[in-house]
Design a protein with these regions (language model features):
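Eukaryotic intrinsically disordered, low-complexity linkers and tails enriched in Pro/Ser/Thr/Gln/Gly
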Residues: 1-17
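Bromodomain acetyl-lysine reader domains
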Residues: 9, 20-137
């Protein structure tokens, strides 16, 4: 049997092993020293940045990703559609850091923190389980 090496492997339905690994990865990122600003949705009113939604039109945060992976209270999970593919999960994580860069600019301390967390994500992604091998007869 051969191993699929193309990036299309992440377009397949999420396996149980991938879901568990992704959830563990997100929880690890949230615990990082630099993870704090990315745990919850940006409260732009409390932070006094009312223009935030005009710049960041598709907000995302690690806590929301965790819920979409099945983490957190069951009644909260019902409000978050689960990921169908690993690609969708990866896209949401990348969106967190793209939004950070778009709003804060490249030299802001929060952006630097985001780069550190994203680097840890990239390292963890290298160990993401592949799809369960299927025999073809």
């Amino acid at each position: 049997m051969s191993t699929v090496t193309s990036t299309s492997v992440w377009s397949r339905p999420v396996t149980s092993a991938q879901q568990k690994y992704a959830l563990s990865t997100i929880r690890g990122l949230k615990k990082m020293k630099d993870g704090g600003p990315f745990i919850y949705p940006v409260d732009y009113i409390a932070l006094g940045i009312p223009h935030y939604p005009t710049i960041v039109t598709h907000p995302m945060d690690l806590g929301t990703i965790e819920k979409k992976l099945g983490g957190g209270p069951k009644m909260e999970q019902a409000n978050y559609p689960p990921y169908n593919t690993v690609d969708e999960f990866i896209a949401d994580v990348r969106l967190v850091f793209r939004n950070c860069l778009s709003f804060n600019g490249p030299d802001h301390v929060i952006t630097q923190m985001g780069k550190n967390v994203e680097e840890a994500f990239n390292k963890a992604l290298k160990n993401m389980p592949g799809p369960e091998e299927v025999s073809v007869f």
